[in-house]
């Protein structure tokens, strides 16, 4: 290693120290999804980031999605994917496959990646320890021609109605890193598939997490000139939605961030999961790596 490389590493470590102290014993929930999940190199970088958070005294919790993998498995089994208003319809046969892919295949892949770093990860879903209960999601869509709202029947797509933090509190006091799939039971005995973003927000809110990070395929919230906005208050976010700066698929993402803050999360970050080590850059550097939304 050259002298210049040593100096750069020393500066980075010096910059990280106060942030390590700030986040010691704090809970950070990371929603892992998007392009990063399909890239082995980015997957290994993500796992090492989570391991380093744990080694630095942080309590990291991973929540993951898996929409593309679910679609691929349904195609493989000859089951047509149905969508209503852009949302997957989950019938009884589909929800079994969703649970198999999310809580089985994907969850264990992430657990294995983190375990390969030398840390201990444990795979869970909302069913474990009665951690999460859900109910059937109530979604409506407005007809653009008649302006009349109609109710969407999405089958076994759910919304979180209750989070019991007992198991997560036990794990926080251990060496374990929870990796959670967004599948949960209802009081009616059915299994529900839950949007991973809202599931992560519910977990983070119940734990009063210091940070909730959403790893996406975009750098964060951009202004009208395409520049990254580093920080927004909830009021500013509402204003940017109203004036069209925040539009399209970013609107539900930002709305989920604001709901999480309302539930008790201290700050929510939208950042680019396609950037290697974006989690560490966000948490342990002054510049951060995405858009921070605060109360």
Curated annotation (Swiss-Prot):
Which reaction(s) are listed as its catalytic activity?
A: N-acetyl-L-glutamate + ATP = N-acetyl-L-glutamyl 5-phosphate + ADP
Family per record: Belongs to the acetylglutamate kinase family. ArgB subfamily.
Which pathway is it part of?
Answer: Amino-acid biosynthesis; L-arginine biosynthesis; N(2)-acetyl-L-ornithine from L-glutamate: step 2/4
Q: Which Gene3D superfamilies does this UniProt record tie to the protein?
A: Acetylglutamate kinase-like (3.40.1160.10)
EC number(s) on record?
A: 2.7.2.8
Q: Which organism is it from?
A: Sinorhizobium fredii (strain NBRC 101917 / NGR234)
* Annotated site residue numbers, Transition state stabilizer: 31, 253
Indicate what this protein is called per its UniProt record.
Answer: Acetylglutamate kinase
Superkingdom classification of source: Bacteria
Q: Where in the cell is it found?
A: Cytoplasm
Positions annotated to bind substrate:
66-67, 88, 193
A GO molecular function term, named singly, is: ATP binding
